[in-house]
Amino acid sequence: VTAAEGPAGTARVPAGPFVHRETVRTATGAVHVAWTSVAAGNLALHVVPPDEAEGLARVSAARRALERVMGVPEGATLYLDQVHSADVVWADGPGRGGASAPVADAAVSRDGSRPLAVMVADCLPVVVVDETTGATAVAHAGRRGLLDGVLEATVDRLLSLRPEADRTGPGLRAWIGPGVCGRCYEVPAAMRDDAAACLPATAATTSWGTPALDLPAGAAEVLRARGVATATIDVCTREDERLFSHRRAPGEGRFAGLVWRADPDATVPRGDA
């Protein structure tokens, strides 16, 4: 997947709410995986000052509008209070954002019935689907979470739902959503070296020749080592204005990686056309 180009090589902002969407067949039915664009609006409450009622209302309205496009009940989507951890929660209970959002950086729906969201603006929004059980997951994989094992923990939680004799990677599919790329994620040399000692694929150099981290490559290394079929949505948040980026425009907002069960009677428009 590449960025649509506008005048003078700038990224074109699409009218639709998604920068990428796919439908996946599982043993228990079809599910959608998708990543929103800036056209869907800021979906993160924490970007808005807590005393700014109008801004908080805009986030709530954006979430409701997105759920209408997804074809799921209002308030059904589980959002997380993300803290750059390796903690995974089950997607059961209320968890409707705000104060009730569980503190974690990954969530698993045992049967895929709960719509899941993970919010980012340079970190990786990873979606995982188990085609054999229908279970679904999302994970927030920034530098800290990736190195601390959030993806391994997510895969382990999904595999725990299988019979003990079948707890291996085949049947799991993962999508590494848009994030800051190795050409743009400049870090101190010591930070790059420490990360590369843990995940060699993360070592990179920026397009201007300084030390960098390639988080998508590191995430792919982790997932493929666990036998997970992995695809990367090859779009850099810093380079592509269809997406929020903390490095390009701090504080503007967060987009979401999503997974939800398909309604056979609903038509979900594509946002990457």
Predicted features along the sequence, with ranges:
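Active-site microenvironment for binding and transforming phosphate-containing groups
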Residues: 1-273
